[in-house]
Amino acid sequence: MTFDKGSLILVDYTAKVKDDGEVFDTTIEADAKKHSLHEENVKYHPKLVSIGETSYPVLKGFDEALAKTSVGDKLTVEVTPDKGFGERDSKKVRMIPIRKLGEDAEKVSVGDTIEVDNKRGTIRYIGSGRVQIDYNHRYAGKTILFDVNVLKSLDSSNDKVGAILKERLPVEDTKIAFDLKDKEVSVTVPEEILRADGLQIMKHFIQLDIFKFVKTLEKISFVETHINKQAPANKPEAKEKTPEQKTV
């Protein structure tokens, strides 16, 4: 059984460059640690993919291969540059005076990613007072291999809502809670992100995605509970002491 356009699926994968075997992306924490990619603030969990859709996209070649798979499949997908990160374009490689980097001039080295003129590029050469910056994608011109495990097809409304929240909310999965009843869903906003920058944007995209992929829903509510942490704690009232009786 293959997947139709718009299907939501969960996959685990590890991606590497075919030529030299460089591993640069993974959903699996053990692989991230093994290849020195691990980051403490990154959530390692199966990736949510929307087949043929832009909501939760992957590289075109990867998407096309996933559409032909079934749950339980384990395979290696080869993605060529034309359906991956694109071909290299020599026009995107520029040589600039190193002084243009300002205070960063003495801090950068070959291989660093830097932003110049509002564009991000990779430093390829430093010398003679000049810096060569490559504005191609770091893996442009490279064939990519994905070792992938197709874990689950999200078919129920409950599974779809849960997966969307896990993908969109920057908290541990155990802190995500929602209540789905008939044509309504109530989403509890975790306390730790109540004051987070971009919360309204998160909520905006969550409701867009849920309405898009769970077409039976008519209403989404976001529940925010604010606790007054400055309120004085209630202390038990002290009992009135009885006068001590003295014996003569």
Regions found by a protein language model. Give the residues of each.
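FKBP-type peptidyl-prolyl cis-trans isomerases
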Residues: M1-V248
